[in-house]
Amino acid sequence: MQVSIVNEHKYRELEPLNEMLVKRGGVKMIPEPKFVISGLVDNEEYVIKLRIDLADEFRYSYQNQQWTPFAPSTKNSKLSAITETEHRKETGATWNMRIVQFDKLLITREFNDIQRNVIHVEPNHKYIPVLTIQNVTTGKSTEFQFQQMEFIAVKSYQSARIRHTKRAPRKMNLAPGSSQKPQLIVPDILHSPTYGFTAAPPPFPFEYWLLYPQIQYQIQQLAYSLPMGPPMVPIHHIQCTEASQRVYAPEYGWNSILMPGAHKEQDDHYMFHHEIWAPQDHELEKLHVLTEQKNKPSETPQ
């Protein structure tokens, strides 16, 4: 029977001593414990368990960029051995072909949070995971320990190198299943599928595909285009050539404001033409109307 660690290179990056962050409510272990087992009897049933034991009887402190023991361990430091997580029993042939991982395992620093798949660890103490393989058919159990999996439980990371190593993968949220090969996501970003004029169909409360099947089946775009026109031209892109006309009149000079009707500004928004007059234009227009009425010959009754 042989047992090996799957992600052993991650533990090598955290040497000489890993730090495991623990919080209230429980957090997952980083790296996650994963094992590969070989040499089990195919027709016999096994149960695989994992617990966390206290590595020694000391309490540690971080000084001069290293962990050193300074006091005996506390009473609650041994409570981790009372809880363990296990998989359901499977045949040896199944375990030989499977990666054994404990993704539901959580570690906490609060004794009240102890429950199934939640193990209590005391901060500033050294622990080591213990893998137990129990043969249900014969009743024998075998335990495995790996020194590179030892860790110090901490409330906050003390080593800057370990803090950077564990938080670096969280800088870019990758798609599920692509964390091992982030370069595979780049073609998807550069060449994202399009649905007509939109990058992606928005969510609708009704069945949107019944109205526009060409969004779901892109081949139908050849015969049935989407019922939407080209985008509206922005207003500031419309150039009005009649808005800056200046007319010279000898009696007024180049002052177009005093000339009634000589300088008109047009608003071409959405193809509607509106003449915009200045206040002087209105005053001159009124004066022009009054002058025309005064000079108009009066009609005398015959």
Swiss-Prot record:
Q: Which GO molecular function entries does the Swiss-Prot or TrEMBL record give?
A: DNA-binding transcription factor activity, RNA polymerase II-specific; RNA polymerase II cis-regulatory region sequence-specific DNA binding
What SUPFAM superfamilies does this protein map onto?
p53-like transcription factors (SSF49417)
Q: Which UniProt keywords apply?
A: DNA-binding, Nucleus, Transcription, Transcription regulation
The UniProt annotation gives the DNA-binding region as 5-180
Q: Which SMART domains does UniProt cross-reference here?
A: TBOX
Q: What is its main location?
A: nucleus
Q: Which CDD domains match?
A: T-box (cd00182)
Kindly list the biological process annotations in GO that this record carries.
cell fate specification; positive regulation of DNA-templated transcription; regulation of transcription by RNA polymerase II
Q: Which Pfam families match?
A: T-box
The record ties this protein, via InterPro entries, to: p53-like_TF_DNA-bd_sf, T-box_DNA-bd, T-box_sf, TF_T-box
Localisation: Nucleus
Q: Which GO terms describe its cellular component?
A: chromatin; nucleus
Check the record and name the PROSITE patterns matching this protein.
TBOX_3 (PS50252)
Protein name in UniProt: Putative T-box protein 34
What organism is the protein native to? Caenorhabditis elegans
